C-alpha cells in the first residue's frame, strides 16, 4: 500500500513489515574480532594502499574533510528499533563495527562450520583498512514520535521537497539514517555494507542504495586533482579549502554560537541529491554551448576568459555576461558577492553508472553530496539560485534527502549519538 505525503512524493508503507522480517532474521549475535594476525601482503593498487587508514575517534567524523577515495556508496536505511533503548543499541553496535572495519584486523573465525560464517570472506583472512571511512547521518524522520527525540532535532533539518526540475522517486528518497561508505577499492566498500547488515537484521532495513566512483588518479592525488564528472567537466573546483580549520569551522561544522541543540556541535548538515544525466543528448551538444552552460573551459576547468582552473572569475568586470553567461552554472552557484559568502558548502560528489533506463538510455549521473553548517544558508540557497539554469535541460534529480552527520565518537568509551540519547 502507498500514500502520497504532503510533498507529493509516493511513500511505501514499510516499517511494520520490515520490523517483523528483521526480527525473524536475527539468529544470534556476531562477535567483534579483536585479535590481529600478522598481515600478509594482499594485492594493492599501489604500495601499501590497502594499509592506509583514517582515524576513527575524534571531534568530527571521517569521510567529510577526508580527501575523496576512489569508491563510494550511499545507503539509506529505515530504523526498525522499537524504542529509545533499541536505538541506543543500534548506535553502539554501529560504533563498534565502524571502529573495527576502518582500522582493520583479522577476519573473525567461525568456530562451528555448521553455523553461518562470521564474515563474508570477500576480503580474505585479513580485513585491510583500505582507507575506509563510514559516515553516519540521521534523517528528519528519526525525530518523529517513535523515540521521543523531536525536541532535539537539528533546527534546520527538514524533509527534502521538490524543486521545479526534480522528478523524485519515493523509493530513492529520504531515510532514518544514511551511511556514506568510501574506500580505495569497491570490494572494501561492499564488505563494510554486508558486515553492517549482517550485524543489524532486527535494527536496520535498506531503503535505497547507490554506488559511485571517481578516477583512481584523482583519488590518489589526495585532493590536489579535481575529479571529472560524466559530463566531462571538473566537479568541485570552487570547493573551500578543507585543510583550513578556521574556514571549516565557518563553512562545515555546527558550532556553539548557532543556537542549535548542544549535541549537534561538531556535526554537519548533509544534502544528498541523486542526479541523472541525459548523456546522449549532452554528447550531441556543441562544445561552445557546453562551456557556456558551465561557464568553464572543458579541458582546463578555467573560468571562461581565464587561464587556470582555480582562477577566480571577475564578474564585476563582466556585468552583462558576455564572457561568463549570467545563467551559467558557476555564476549562479557562487556569484562571488558579499551576500553569497554565507552559502559556501563543501562538495563531495561521485559519478554513478547503472546500465540503461527502461527507455533504453544510459543511466549515468552524479551522486551529489555536500556538507555545511547551515542547510538553509548552504545548499537550499544555492539550489534556489540554480532554479532555471541552462544545465537543467540535461540533468534530472531523481532522489536523495537531507540529513545531519553526527558529531564524531570521542574515544573508546563513547558511541554515536551519545549526547543526543542521554538528553
UniProtKB/Swiss-Prot annotation:
UniProt signal peptide: 1-35
Subunit structure comment from the entry: Homodimer. Part of a ferrous iron transporter composed of EfeU, EfeO and EfeB. However, this EfeUOB tripartite iron transporter is defective in E.coli strain K12 due to a frameshift mutation in EfeU.
Catalysed conversion reaction: heme b + 2 H(+) = protoporphyrin IX + Fe(2+)
Enzyme Commission number: 4.98.1.1, 1.11.1.-
Subcellular location: Periplasm
Pfam families membership: Dyp_perox_C, Dyp_perox_N
Record-level GO cellular component terms: cytosol; outer membrane-bounded periplasmic space; periplasmic space
PTM comment, free text: Exported by the Tat system. The position of the signal peptide cleavage has been experimentally proven. Can also be exported by the Sec system.
Binding, protoporphyrin IX: 236-238, 296
Lineage of source species: Bacteria, Pseudomonadati, Pseudomonadota, Gammaproteobacteria, Enterobacterales
Binding site for heme b: 236-238, 329, 334-336, 347
Cofactor: heme b
Role this protein plays: Involved in the recovery of exogenous heme iron. Extracts iron from heme while preserving the protoporphyrin ring intact. Also displays peroxidase activity on guaiacol in vitro.
Protein name: Deferrochelatase
GO MF annotation, one: peroxidase activity
Record key words, sorted: Heme, Iron, Lyase, Metal-binding, Oxidoreductase, Periplasm, Peroxidase, Signal
PROSITE patterns for this protein: DYP_PEROXIDASE, TAT
UniProt induction comment: Repressed by Fur in the presence of iron. Repressed at high pH by the two-component regulatory system CpxA/CpxR.
Cofactor stoichiometry and binding remark: Binds 1 heme b (iron(II)-protoporphyrin IX) group non-covalently per subunit.
Organism: Escherichia coli (strain K12)
